[in-house]
């Protein structure tokens, strides 16, 4: 499951379609444009692809931890965490703040 999700994200590379389709399709679908813009702005898209391809182990673990306990109210935050849990967490926080 973790590898599959990471594969989708890594292959997607953009962290837009893949991100919304795999980890938090329900929650991310609503904020797909915002999350996509933020991801592209911060370069998380490219980083996500590289990290997804190179580090499947921490991504899978990070995705589960962030998605479940890290940011329950912000699904896209968890999804970005899956892309690159260290930067993803910050991204999720920033996104949440800006959106609010």
From Swiss-Prot:
Post-translational modification: Elastin is formed through the cross-linking of its soluble precursor tropoelastin. Cross-linking is initiated through the action of lysyl oxidase on exposed lysines to form allysine. Subsequent spontaneous condensation reactions with other allysine or unmodified lysine residues result in various bi-, tri-, and tetrafunctional cross-links. The most abundant cross-links in mature elastin fibers are lysinonorleucine, allysine aldol, desmosine, and isodesmosine.
Modified residues (4-hydroxyproline): 72, 86
Designated name of the protein: Elastin
Family: Belongs to the elastin family.
Subcellular location as annotated: Secreted, Extracellular space, Extracellular matrix
Function: Major structural protein of tissues such as aorta and nuchal ligament, which must expand rapidly and recover completely. Molecular determinant of the late arterial morphogenesis, stabilizing arterial structure by regulating proliferation and organization of vascular smooth muscle.
A GO CC annotation given for this chain: extracellular region
Complex and partners: The polymeric elastin chains are cross-linked together into an extensible 3D network. Forms a ternary complex with BGN and MFAP2. Interacts with MFAP2 via divalent cations (calcium > magnesium > manganese) in a dose-dependent and saturating manner. Interacts with FBLN5 and FBN1. Forms a ternary complex with FBN1 and FBLN2 or FBLN5. Interacts with MFAP4 in a Ca (2+)-dependent manner; this interaction promotes ELN self-assembly. Interacts with EFEMP2 with moderate affinity.
Annotated source species: Ovis aries
Keywords: Disulfide bond, Extracellular matrix, Hydroxylation, Repeat, Secreted
Cysteine pairings via disulfide bonds: 90-95
């Amino acid at each position: 499951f973790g590898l599959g999700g990471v594969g989708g994200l890594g292959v997607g590379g953009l962290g837009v379609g893949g991100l919304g389709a795999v980890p938090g399709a329900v929650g991310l679908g609503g904020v797909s444009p915002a999350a996509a813009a933020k991801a592209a702005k911060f370069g998380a898209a490219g980083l996500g692809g590289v990290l997804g391809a190179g580090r499947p182990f921490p991504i899978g673990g990070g995705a589960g931890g962030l998605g479940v306990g890290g940011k329950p109210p912000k699904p896209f935050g968890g999804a970005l965490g899956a892309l690159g849990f260290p930067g993803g967490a910050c991204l999720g926080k920033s996104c949440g703040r800006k959106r609010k």
